[in-house]
Amino acid sequence: MPKGTGKVLAQNRKASHDYIIEETIEAGIELKGTEIKSIRRGSANLRDSYARVYKGEVFVYNMHIAPYEEGNRFNHDPLRTRKLLLKRKQIDKLFGQTREQGYTLVPLKLYIKNGYCKMLIGVAKGKKDYDKRHALKAKEAKREMDRAMKERY
């Protein structure tokens, strides 16, 4: 595979709907052989996953990576807890931010960069129902304005 940034292999689209993402951090992810092969095929899912700081390390939970078809007995557990690779200062910063009420770590994207699998995680705060409705109204208003401008010209 050529060096450089590759395509996004998995994306958590629901995160931007359910959370206000305040900051993003790129982290490496510790994987087994059959897991990386399965991810390169595009069979990873971030939908219900979340990250947490535990005993000075960051782990991602409920990230589903489908078993590799040719892996037979060497296959992995699809919902295994996986360690994220971050520097100590980054971990301490994330720990401080998530101790505040209402903040959590949400996996946003999974991609290949320079041959290594990386995950973009976000420090996020949950949206209330009225925030979601307000965002939907603003999106609809922008769409209407764009339609009107398109018809005008």
Curated annotation (Swiss-Prot):
Keywords assigned by UniProt, alphabetized: Cytoplasm, RNA-binding
Gene3D superfamilies, alphabetized: 2.40.280.10
Gene Ontology annotations for the cellular component aspect, listed alphabetically: cytosol
One Pfam family linked to the record: SmpB
GO biological process, one term: trans-translation
Listed CDD domains: SmpB (cd09294)
Domain of life: Bacteria
InterPro entries xrefs: SmpB, SsrA-bd_prot, SsrA-bd_prot_CS
PANTHER family: SSRA-BINDING PROTEIN, TMRNA-BINDING COMPONENT OF TRANS-TRANSLATION TAGGING COMPLEX
General function of this protein: Required for rescue of stalled ribosomes mediated by trans-translation. Binds to transfer-messenger RNA (tmRNA), required for stable association of tmRNA with ribosomes. tmRNA and SmpB together mimic tRNA shape, replacing the anticodon stem-loop with SmpB. tmRNA is encoded by the ssrA gene; the 2 termini fold to resemble tRNA(Ala) and it encodes a 'tag peptide', a short internal open reading frame. During trans-translation Ala-aminoacylated tmRNA acts like a tRNA, entering the A-site of stalled ribosomes, displacing the stalled mRNA.
Family membership: Belongs to the SmpB family.
NCBIfam families per the UniProt record, alphabetical: PRK05422.1 (NF003843), smpB (TIGR00086)
Protein name: SsrA-binding protein
